[in-house]
């Protein structure tokens, strides 16, 4: 009974570490979406030339709003998933464009959530299918990048089997740490492409709903 109680007790330092990791992830994804989307916004507003100062100012002004957006996505998606997996998936797809709504339409978090449901109406399945393709490609590329890490892991494991049997930590040397770090950095950078793809999903949905001509404007800038 004592062993069970001790296993279920999480040390305070571990809880603090998990909380800090969660906050770091929220800040990271908020800043990533903010930088990429404000870059696109500046690119469109300045006819194909992004202004770094404009991007920095936009991210600074929207930081707390974007952070609140990240928290709202996490809470609503988690709540939907706990009720049943399908509601979680549905809400996740609906809110996939919320960062773009916050940045491009200057809406507050609550208004942005409402607008996402309006924006995706009658387009949920198409958006879902597009996101599936994007994330399949994303994870496929990540797997390719991680191949050197796995090869190194298995070669070292077989060549140092006797040493590792007495000291498992010997498997995780500087070579493994370096390859893992490179793969993680590439993974974070690659997520930029996911943000870009979701931004174009937003423009497509907005164009179909309101006929604003934004997609034609972007195409015309790209052809200059």
List each model region and its residues.
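Juxtamembrane transition segments at transmembrane-helix termini in multipass membrane proteins
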Residues: 4, 37-45, 91-109, 119, ...
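Hydrophobic transmembrane alpha-helix segments characteristic of membrane transport
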Residues: 33-59
């Amino acid at each position: 009974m004592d062993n069970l109680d001790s296993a279920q007790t999480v040390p305070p330092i571990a809880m603090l570490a998990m909380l800090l990791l969660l906050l770091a992830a929220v800040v990271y994804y908020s800043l990533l979406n903010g930088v990429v989307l404000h870059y696109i916004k500046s690119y469109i507003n300045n006819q194909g030339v992004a202004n770094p100062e404009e991007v920095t100012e936009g991210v600074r002004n929207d930081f707390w709003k974007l952070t609140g957006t990240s928290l709202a996505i996490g809470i609503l998606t988690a709540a939907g998933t706990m009720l049943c997996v399908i509601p979680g998936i549905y809400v996740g797809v609906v809110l996939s464009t919320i960062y773009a709504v916050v940045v491009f339409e200057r809406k507050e978090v609550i208004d942005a959530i409402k607008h996402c449901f309006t924006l995706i109406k009658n387009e949920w399945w198409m958006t879902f299918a597009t996101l599936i393709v994007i994330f399949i490609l994303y994870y496929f590329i990540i797997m390719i990048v991680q191949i050197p890490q796995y090869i190194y892991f298995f070669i070292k494991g077989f060549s140092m089997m006797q040493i590792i049997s007495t000291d498992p930590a010997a498997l995780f040397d500087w070579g493994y740490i370096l390859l893992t770090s490179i793969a993680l950095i590439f993974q974070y950078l690659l997520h930029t492409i996911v943000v870009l793809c979701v931004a174009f999903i937003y423009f497509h949905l907005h164009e179909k709903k309101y006929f604003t001509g934004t997609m034609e404007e972007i195409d015309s800038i790209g052809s200059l």
